[in-house]
Amino acid sequence: MFKFRKKSHQEVLDNIPNHIGIIMDGNGRWAKKRLQPRVMGHKAGMDALQKVTIEASQLGVKVLTVYAFSTENWSRPQDEVKFIMNLPVEFFNKYVPELDKNNVRILTIGDNSRLPKETLDALEKAVEQTKHNSGLILNFALNYGGRAEIVSAVQAIAKEVEIGRLRPEAIDEDLIAKHLMTDKLPYLYRDPDLIIRTSGELRLSNFLPWQSAYSEFYFTDVFWPDFDQQGLHQAISDYNKRHRRFGGV
């Protein structure tokens, strides 16, 4: 069992999840509470992500998948969408050197076709710069929708059947998983062990629906910009109290 002792105090965290997914929710409400524009909440959320990523890396987490922008988020006010689309540019310019120094590798899942060129260029540059790192994988779900991901996988499999490359009876869970965007992750860590959602909302919101079949869930009322290293520790501590049966007894 993996144990991590934080130097600053005597807390011991057992059984660190290999893959943690985070639905980073509450940026707008955080800003509203402070009488600030919603976009300031997104900016503060960016700083929170950096802190949590470094902490997760030091704890020994293998993959951190963060829900940065969903396919449904395009319906938000255009000024807000434009600001959010620029956040990856700002985040990577500001934080990639530190992430690289901490051996963090950056990947992404989602439909890149709708991303602005500046956003896509920054993302591709960060992926390229960190591709040789062997530590934590920071996996951005950007313009991602779980149902769309499954539909795309089914369509790809159907085409293989249509041209005679694949027999229908050969379709199984492993084959479907290989056609999902998370197939780029290490095989043992493709599915999240723990999914954290901030802000008090109690739903999955189309985030990794296939991959989360046996995930444990942790919900907190804390808005994402206020979620910090201690919040991550609390989530993992709660995770350690669970007994994962995977359908067994």
From Swiss-Prot:
Mg(2+) binds at D25, E216. Its cofactor is Mg(2+). The keyword Lipoprotein does not apply. Substrate binds at residues 26-30, 38, 42, 70-72, 74, 76, 197, 203-205. Binds 2 magnesium ions per subunit. The active site is at D25, N73. GO terms for biological process: polyprenol biosynthetic process. The keyword Transferase applies. GO terms for cellular component: cytosol. GO terms for molecular function: ditrans,polycis-undecaprenyl-diphosphate synthase [(2E,6E)-farnesyl-diphosphate specific] activity; magnesium ion binding; manganese ion binding. CDD domains: Cis_IPPS. Keywords: Magnesium, Metal-binding, Transferase. InterPro entries: UPP_synth-like, UPP_synth-like_CS, UPP_synth-like_sf. Its EC number is 2.5.1.-. Homodimer. Belongs to the UPP synthase family. Catalyzes the condensation of isopentenyl diphosphate (IPP) with allylic pyrophosphates generating different type of terpenoids. HAMAP family: ISPT. This is Isoprenyl transferase. It comes from Streptococcus thermophilus (strain ATCC BAA-250 / LMG 18311). The gene is uppS.
